Amino acid sequence: MMIPAWRPDKAMNIEAPEFASYVHQLEQVSGVTITKFADMVDALKKRHDFFQANGCKLSDHGIEEFYDEEYTDSQIETIFEKAMRGQQLSNLEIRQYKNCFLTVMAEMDADADWTQQFHYGAIRNNNTKMLNQLGPDTGFDSIGEFNTAKAMAKFLNKLNMEDKLTRTILYTLNPCANEVIATMLGNFQGGEPGKIQFGSGWWFNDQKDGMERQMNALSVLGLLSRFVGMLTDSRSFLSYPRHEYFRRILCNMLGNDVEKGLLPDDRELLGRMVEDISYNNARRYFKFY
């Protein structure tokens, strides 16, 4: 089964030179004339509905970090208008806008009963010379270091207080934050098993050591048996074998713990757990069928 996912990063990255041109493209595809931020939200809602009509059940947001800067509706409208005129935005304005944008998208996902994903912790396009020569996403990104725990907690808490915190998966690119996320999950669980998930190791951590570190942190501080397991980009179809790679690493970890006497030597119990992590948990969690 192949279904689309919702990735509205271009609407979030208000500081990008191509932001205004993207908004004009959004106007064309949505049929909504966009002169203010509220108009863009209306246009995105139409596209959100279109994605849902075509089977979409997940959103994904690529962010450097979480944001907690306070804002008002009038401030966001002013920031949006400045960006559309090509005016320079301050760092505070960018962060206010992104906080507002992610909140609006999260509320939209909650209303649609989607799962939201946040991939955070990358610093991108570090080599300007190569960016100018080859463009973005050509191999000049790296792991970032951000003090984001408080902002993450504040963001999730705000949604939770509004009853707008849908199923959420948090992915960190920096393994130093593994324990941060593993402990953050417990603050906002409720309503359904494993509602808030620690996402599998991704990008630079999408290898044996990275996968083991992520799963070890989750098993020590959370509940590994509720884990929804591995993921991959559908656009990178040749990377699908990483699911088999992941399953072998998972089984090896559990087998080693059995040999050390840390887990019961119960093939039925552990076999069912592996099946759940490999397939059943994700099927139930994402409500595919």
Which stretches of residues belong to each language-model region?
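Extended, charged catalytic domains and RNA/DNA-binding interfaces, predominantly
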Residues: M1-T115, Y120-I143, K158, F227, ...
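Histidine/acidic-residue-rich catalytic or RNA/ligand-binding cores of hydrolases
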Residues: E69-Y71, N126-G135, A177-G186, K208-M215, ...
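C-terminal functional module detector
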Residues: E107, D111-D113, E162, P175-P193
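Divalent-cation-assisted or electrostatically stabilized phosphate/pyrophosphate-binding catalytic cores
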Residues: F146-M152
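Mid-to-C-terminal alpha-helical segments outside catalytic/metal-binding sites
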Residues: L224-R226, R242-Y289
